[in-house]
């Protein structure tokens, strides 16, 4: 064995391309999840993308993705037309196709079983609705879950449940206080089946034999589908509405297996293979669920819907678009003048200083380092401008160091999370977003509702949130220079800013009312007209 390892080490050093070609098919059979990661790395040669995939390769599994510093020199920039690149890409493609085939068989086998004998789909006759999401942490999707629950309650629905994968800790309950007084029961996903397989678990009504069969049929990375099935069986809902890819796949498959009459899956961005927590089973899971007669697929932007359809090879129109909805009563610009002044005073920001800001998670896909690069270029021409970055995340300290290295560390304020993000946004003169990938960002809508013009990278559905040249700018390509030019253009045109404040507030109120989002959601639940009937009661 030591001789084999020595030969392998020499091969990796002297012939790395050949070593990679050998390694991928070997990993496919012995460590398929790691092979999937390595395969993607072989296909990606852009600098930022390569660093992302290297970070996951180090961990050995996509589920344990890490954020790493963007250190130069980790990946050699081989040309896309080189023989080595083409050979490695071909090997990568074989690995990906193998995994797709593997998971396709898993889902086909699971959904082909006649589960009625265990779970009895005829018992799903109540009115309960279960929404499933990871947490109620400080994210845009989480905020929309809360808005949906509040809207359903206002429309007359009382049998509401929220199933969170994790609800412990303050950060994971960031929006929970908004549901106080709302007729919704919040619970956390069971950690396992416990004694359900032998008739225990504290609920004699649960079909324990079926849960055990389901769990035993699934590979290790999908066994928690049985946990979703257990918790959903305890409620026997008429509707399961899952949010975000991980929950869509696992809660969706669990709901399909146990016979929930209506399953709605809300995708909230572009395809999951653009994000660190992507899992190799997701594509085939979505394909299997798309063919299920009780499943309705949603996205919150046209760009996101079309991206999923292309990724999955599905016909145009398979994904319906239900845009985010907002209660604009809490986003009146006139009501935020005093809180905005108080916010600036609390952070020591002069009321006279132009303030460019953002609300973001300090993570790779939000590109906070690019945000700082834009700020540095703006400050070169406008030394009076201050900068504000609201939020937290794994790259926060690196972002702070980068700002200091750019010479603007004393002009960027990073206070962490703010409960009252609306007052923070209202204190800004311009909102800047530099994301690499996005769905339909809540913050862009909220900023415009408060009369704050926006500059954003043109990705996903960002351009759908604004009127180009009237309420802000969606910029492409995503260079710091182009983004800085858009920012400076707005800062240097006071009449334009005044007109944009009014136009932006009016535009988002017409396009993103909560009533329209609820109507689309209830159409997905019941079909046309249900929202109107409830509203007229």
Model-identified regions with their sequence ranges:
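A short, active-site helix/loop in glycosyltransferases that binds the activated sugar's phosphate group
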Residues: 84-93, 292-333
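Short His-centered aromatic/hydrophobic patch
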Residues: 221, 242-248, 267
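A short, well-ordered alpha-helix in the C-terminal region of glycosyltransferases
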Residues: 342-345, 398-401, 489, 496-510, ...
């Amino acid at each position: 064995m030591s001789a084999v390892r020595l030969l392998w080490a020499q091969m990796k050093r002297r012939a790395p391309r050949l070593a990679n070609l050998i390694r991928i098919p070997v990993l496919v059979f012995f460590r398929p999840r790691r092979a999937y990661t390595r395969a993607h790395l072989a296909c990606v040669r852009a600098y930022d993308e390569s660093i992302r995939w290297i970070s996951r390769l180090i961990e050995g599994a996509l589920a344990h993705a890490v954020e790493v510093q963007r250190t130069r020199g980790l990946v050699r920039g081989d040309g896309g037309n080189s023989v080595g690149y083409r050979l490695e890409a071909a090997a990568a493609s074989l690995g990906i196709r193998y995994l797709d085939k593997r998971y396709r068989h898993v889902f086909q086998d699971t959904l082909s079983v006649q589960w009625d004998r265990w779970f009895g789909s005829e018992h799903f006759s109540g009115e309960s609705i279960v929404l499933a999401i990871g947490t109620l942490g400080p994210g845009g999707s989480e905020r929309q879950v809360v808005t949906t629950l509040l809207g359903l309650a206002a429309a007359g629905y009382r049998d509401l449940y929220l199933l969170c994968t994790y609800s412990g800790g303050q950060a994971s309950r960031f929006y929970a206080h908004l549901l106080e007084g709302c007729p919704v029961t919040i619970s956390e996903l069971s950690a396992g089946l416990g004694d359900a397989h032998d008739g225990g678990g504290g609920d004699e009504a649960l079909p324990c034999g079926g849960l055990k069969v389901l769990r035993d049929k699934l590979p290790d990375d999908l066994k928690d589908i049985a946990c979703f099935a257990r918790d959903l069986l305890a409620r026997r809902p008429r509707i399961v509405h899952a949010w975000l890819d991980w929950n869509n796949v696992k809660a969706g498959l669990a709901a399909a297996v146990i016979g929930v009459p209506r399953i709605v899956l809300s995708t909230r961005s572009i395809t999951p293979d653009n994000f660190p927590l992507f899992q190799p089973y997701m594509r085939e899971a979505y394909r299997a669920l798309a063919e299920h007669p009780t499943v309705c697929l949603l996205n919150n932007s046209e760009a996101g819907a079309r991206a999923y359809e292309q990724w999955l090879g599905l016909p145009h129109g398979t994904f319906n678009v239900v845009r985010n909805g907002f209660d604009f009563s809490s986003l009146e610009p006139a009501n935020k003048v005093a809180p905005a002044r108080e916010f600036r005073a609390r952070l020591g920001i002069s009321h006279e200083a132009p303030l460019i800001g953002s609300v973001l998670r300090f993570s790779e896909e939000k590109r906070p380092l690019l945000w700082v690069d834009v700020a540095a270029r703006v400050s070169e021409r406008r030394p009076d401008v201050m900068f504000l970055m609201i939020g937290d995340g794994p790259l926060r300290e690196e972002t702070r160091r980068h700002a200091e290295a750019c010479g603007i560390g004393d002009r960027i304020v990073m206070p962490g999370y703010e409960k009252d993000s609306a007052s923070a946004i209202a204190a800004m003169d311009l909102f800047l977003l530099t994301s690499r990938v996005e769905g339909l960002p809540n913050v862009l809508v909220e900023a415009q509702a408060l009369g704050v013009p926006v500059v954003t990278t043109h990705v996903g559905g960002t351009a759908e949130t604004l009127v180009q040249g009237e309420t802000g700018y969606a910029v492409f390509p995503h260079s710091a220079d182009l983004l800085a030019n858009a920012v400076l253009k707005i800062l240097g045109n006071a009449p334009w800013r005044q007109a944009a404040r009014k136009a932006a507030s009016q535009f988002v109120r017409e396009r993103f009312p909560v009533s329209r989002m609820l109507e689309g959601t209830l159409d997905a639940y019941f079909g046309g007209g249900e929202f109107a009937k409830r509203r007229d009661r």
